């Protein structure tokens, strides 16, 4: 209601990112299937490398990573600007995904990712969901408020 443009952009970016998320997991699925049927590890590794280095796969994976990072930050800004939650909830959501990228890719640390990456994202969105559930029926479908 109070931040429809940024909320729409955040949602669209996240949708696009998660739609391309299969580009991240496809090599894992392929590797598992080929090893499961008995292919040798060297040829499976070579095939997976070819798949991961293929331009559409690289573009999809990169779009997923950048999109879910940017989309989460946009949604965090939107829920704060719309006054759905306090600023610190938006900060939790906005910071959680950069922490996830660092803890999952740059400095692999599963505990950091679970607690401050996806864990913080979960807590932030749970707080947003709680606020939405507490919103009175008459507050829905109102015209945007002027700034």
Spans of model-derived segments:
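Hydrophobic, aromatic-enriched alpha-helical segments typical of multi-pass transmembrane helices
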Residues: 1-147
